[in-house]
Amino acid sequence: MVYTKAWFLQNIARQTLGKNVAVHRPPLKLGNMTNWIQQQQAQTNLSLSNTKAPGSLDERLFLTEDDIIFHDRSIQLGYFDPSLSERKQSPPGKSLHRFVDNLNPNSSHFSASLLPASLSSLCDSTCGDVDDEQQFNSLATSPLSTETQSEVSDPLLDTLTPNSLESSFASISLNSFTSANEFIQFLKRLASSKLSIHTFDLYKLVRNSPELLTLEAYNIVLQCMSTDDYFLSSSKNIQKIIKVYVDMLNSFISPNVTTFETVIFALCRRAKFVHQKIESLSKRTIYAHPSIAKEIQPELLDLQSEMPLQTAVFMFTSSLINHDLIYSPQFYAILIESVSLYGTQSQLDSLLECVPLGTIEANGHPDLLPALIRALGRAKRLNSCFQLLERYNLSDPTSDTSMTNVRSWEGLMEAYFDTDHHVEASALMKSFFRKADSNQVIPSSILDCFLRRLAQLGHYKESAEWLGMAIEKISTYKASPSTLSSILEAACLNNNDKFAIAFVRKYTLSRFSDCHAVLLRYLDLLARSGNVDLLHLHAYPVICSVSSHTNFTFSNVYKAFIENGKIDVALRLLRKHIDPKVSLGNNTAPSSNSVALQLSILNGFWEVLTEELQKDVHVLLSLVSTLENQVNFPQVDFTTPLLRHITGYLVSRRLEPELISPRVFGFLLEYAAFNVVQTEGTFTSKVILTDLLKCYSNGTYKASFKNVHVVLRSFTYLKEDEMLVASVRDDIVSEAVVGFSTDNNGQKILADISQVCYCLDDLECIDQSINSLVSKMLTSASPEQVDVNILFFQFGKLIETNKFLHPEVYPTLISVLSKNKRFDAVQRVFEHSKHLYRKISTKSLEKANWFMALILDAMILSSSFARQFKSSNLFCDNMKMLGYIPRASTFAHLINNSTRRGDTDDATTALNIFEETKRHNVKPSVFLYNAVLSKLGRARRTTECWKLFQEMKESGLLPTSVTYGTVINAACRIGDESLAEKLFAEMENQPNYQPRVAPYNTMIQFEVQTMFNREKALFYYNRLCATDIEPSSHTYKLLMDAYGTLKPVNVGSVKAVLELMERTDVPILSMHYAAYIHILGNVVSDVQAATSCYMNALAKHDAGEIQLDANLFQSQIESLIANDRIVEGIQIVSDMKRYNVSLNAYIVNALIKGFTKVGMISKARYYFDLLECEGMSGKEPSTYENMVRAYLSVNDGRKAMEIVEQLKRKRYPLPVVNRISSLVNSHMGQKPKRRSLNTSHSSLASLGNASTQHSINSSIN
């Protein structure tokens, strides 16, 4: 169905004026519903005071289901749909039925809006298909219909809800709620847990069950949604809140003051977001190149079309009709403040007309009085501002620095300027300065407001004088960047370069580093005034950041340098300006398209070059070097003239070979080839490429390639120059295979080279039929889905017939078999490939070696999967003997599988392997970087991890969500919250971003376990739920930890999470029981409840519903030990044996701590040594640390040192070893008195009598 503006407003009218709305004479000539409702106040009150049965009034005086327009005799209202800011009279002289037809949704004249424009997208986006017209007619034809929408699903709710949540909540049975109260209680638990997205999903599920949705239920849903930033982050999401409100009206539930305040609060917050976003986008479009501005413009226009405050003001004013509502001072403060800051003048006037200034207590909230003064000043009502100041007897801000007092005077200062009384503002400031001489302080916010507004009027010199006086007389005052930028901007707008230069020198350029638009105007002023020396000094440090935030190309700056004969300065600045390392390293740069910006900068630079400079060889070489430094081939507009001019110098040999490096010449060949491919072989592009190939073939210029596949691909366009291509092909291929290119497109590159290097398709020994079948099996499914038995059956036929597969199939076959752990089959394929190698070598040894290099590369991969590291090294050595090295992906697998038994520092191993790839000039891939980053992150070597991540981006590789997940995890491991948040935001803004649950879980776990911040944990949880991926079981466990381990502990919310999982059919696993046991036993010390939960988990296992793991037993043991019930803790160990669950290091850690607590060190040592037994998981560094602490607790330094020696033999990283050994060194340095281990027996008194000791011993035995 379609939700029109008229439909929305008339739903509100129905609630504010009643179902049947009387229309009285004289006729109201109003063009929109908002004003009509406002002016109906008196008439409606009259109708209510003179109560009369509806039937006794003339039927035409009521708006019923069929009367959507307003009429009186020959004058009809509501035919047109003007904006709310305009007043248009409906055209007279039309018959009534004509206007009714116009309101029919099937009519082409059907009005789409009397609703505020902020909701126009809601009206348009909720249209169903044409097939839904019948439903539409039954509901939308009459906005005042007594029928509800309970039987119709809403496409808005269906499309705006993430699929994962929709599918999970679809499993909830409405019959599970026995009453509305039970539903409301569950809703309250979700809301109190701030699970706003789940609250909305639950609402969507029950919206067809009006018996469950009461006013209280609606308010709970609205309050939960309006406090969540997710629902305010976009126009689509804010519409969900409005939609819930409209559903309530359709259900004939009258909103109360809580309802109105909640929805209006949400609209005010949305208005602030829209305002800030518009400001940001405007700065990036006003100075941008048209091609970039065109990309940003649609988003900007969409935001500008939103008017959330129009809706907020309308809802507030209409709510006053026939509603005895008393709004809170906080509500007035927020609404008035929002409209005065972000609203239009007409919105502010409409609001102030309805605000009961005489009755509300402005001192009821600290923000209300300042908001009122600011609003009245903007409304040009300065006398009212003075009246408020007198009424509440505000003190001088130099003596009373309370927040309300200072902000009120700041509002008065704004009011002076809003009403064109800046002279009076200056007089007021003078009075403040006279009092400042008496050691009183002028609040900085008032000073900044005065200076900023004065500068914006154009009185920048006077503002600067006031600023100097403030700095001189007030020692604590420091001008804000916005104040400084306002003064500088005004000077630039007035073209006063002398003042601007002096002002920047006085306050330093660094003070303006974040004022990008002002810096842009300043640099432009320097360029126009010809101050090129100062321009060079000031442009160099800021040009990159200013461009990133404004999308400005600075062609005027380059033009100024060129016109003043400083072309070298311009070229150096250009190189820095588009340096990919600078742009990629600036993660906060908001440029929507950095590539488009770089192209615009380059094209703008070429345009300001004179015709002579466009042919200058040094300029051309500098430009080529700059282009070569970019990540990809820049598709600039001057590619052809650049290549044509520089090729002319090369062909005529006017360019000495020593002036052009092999890499620059190689780039010229690649760039020319790229141009041929891009233009699909135009005549000019092919001429340039052939000329460069001739220069390469005669040996005059040496070349070094990075993207040789582009050159090889361009050969298909040079069929008329086959002899030239043949003469250079072998040299280029030889250059290509050195380094064995292996980036993301490596497989395609290798295919290109294979076609050039050896065309083996016509080998007679290849069985084409089996080769085709095997190739199809290998490529049509993932390796895990390939039927290995059938695959190897086909391969067996080749052995029987002495036939072979195509050489390129063998590496893929080995890879698939390896991933399926069929290493015996891999060995047979390897032996078979040796026979093919011998056959190929009879024709071409070079081609045979290349084939064997591919096979050996695959065998290295296979050996790494099998963890046969000696074999991997052997195969690698054989490759090197042939002149080849493994691919990047092969090295990545070596790193991933590099952990040998007993090796506890695999990060160093990973770095050594990675350094080997660099030594051999292997082109790294994303997969390779991910492998190294993962190892470094787990080893907490974050500095190296971050450095490698930056190196990866600088090399032009685009990080994936896996990459970001790794570096985010590394940042979390060292507790760097700002870095983790920065990386997370960067990950979500990546163009190739594919959401994965792991990074979200990492951030949630980090906020819960490291930062102890429940609010942020819930923020990331809701962000996860807003994607199209489902939360994992671990996510729910972390959510339980957020409520159950962080203060204030909320066990009710923990239960709500479990109830949510149960109602949505999410399996409750052993980890969830373990988390709940920990919360009950360790956090709230309710050991009985924890034990009950533990027994319930065992019963669930016995019933076959869950699978037990060590975490469950660990939580119960820790719970018992925390409550001094070590005996029962030992009994849990017996339960583990009964359920075939092995001890692990973490359970033993708990037992060691428990026994240490009661002085039973020998028992602790028993379990410590038990981990070395066969079938146990082994010790962790924390296990050694706990045992060391146990011995030190009884002053047995010698035994503690023995444990440290054991640790050293395990080859753990040195920092880990040093940290634990320092415990012993510190203890030995103190030389404490030694206690006998026998004291442990005396400590048993804390456990009870001798029978307790017997219980422990028997449990252990």
From Swiss-Prot:
- Just give the chief location class: mitochondrion
Tell me the name of the encoding gene.
Answer: ppr5
Task performed by this protein:
Mitochondrial RNA-binding protein that acts as a general negative regulator of mitochondrial translation.
Matching entries from InterPro entries are given as: Pentatricopeptide_rpt (IPR002885), TPR-like_helical_dom_sf (IPR011990)
Mind listing the GO molecular function terms for this protein? mRNA binding
The lineage is: Eukaryota, Fungi, Dikarya, Ascomycota, Taphrinomycotina
**Official protein name in the record:** Pentatricopeptide repeat-containing protein 5, mitochondrial
Q: Does the keyword Transit peptide apply?
A: yes
* UniProt GO BP: mitochondrial gene expression; regulation of translation; translation
